[in-house]
Amino acid sequence: MRCLLLHGIGGSPFEMMPLAEALTAAGFEAHAPALPGHGGTEEAYLASAFAQWRDFAHAEYARLSGGGPVLLAGYSLGGILALDVAQAAARGDLPPPAGLLALATPLFFHKYFPFFAVDWRFFALPLWARLQPVLRVPERDPASRAVAPWQGHERICCLRHFAEVERALPAIRRGLPLIRAPLCIVQLRGDTSCRPYNAFYLERHCGSLSTHLHLLRVRSQHGGHLPMTHQESRQRAAELAVAFAREVAGATKACKFAPRRL
């Protein structure tokens, strides 16, 4: 079975490598492509847009689906794109996925009840994105890098990108009941970029007939949004990904070879 692993905003395939390596070792065919504008220059990243990322995810999934059912996995932005692809499949625009693995996938950047926000600016994100489309931010500190390695455009935060994603989220939330593929949700309990509320919301509103929700606890104060590379959770996250892949691959084979009534 093929597995499509979609990385997060501003990041790179590096963040999906622990899962890709574990899935490959378990006998699966893992693909972790770079989204448009990622993995290159800052100019290319800033010139990219959510519509490009969505089109790329759809095209890559369609390409891989030519060889049979695909496990669709995504982290953060990649999880949002995976949900969008799964909804397109539910509408008949794409082949149905074997399963859906959502890693630290935000469905809300902020809420008033329960009260939380990725950043205080996100309460007025459309305005801030117009006034200050790109923020220059400090580098990650050495402790964070050691605990949860990450590669990407860490010195810039493109509010325009986040505003584009936020505009897409209401339609994605409305489409969750369409999804029927088995679902596995993984994130860290202390994630302040993607609060656990998002995981519970996805579990409650997704139409999947089989759902697994895993909130992993870590002691470190660093790297809370990176369950795949965090030194305290990466092995467990990889194990969960492999177990879920085996589960959905087995279900796919059972459906394929089940006797048909005449």
Question: Which residue ranges define each predicted feature?
Answer:
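Conserved alpha/beta-hydrolase "acid-adjacent" motif
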Residues: 192-198
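Active-site nucleophile loop of the alpha/beta-hydrolase fold
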Residues: 101-112
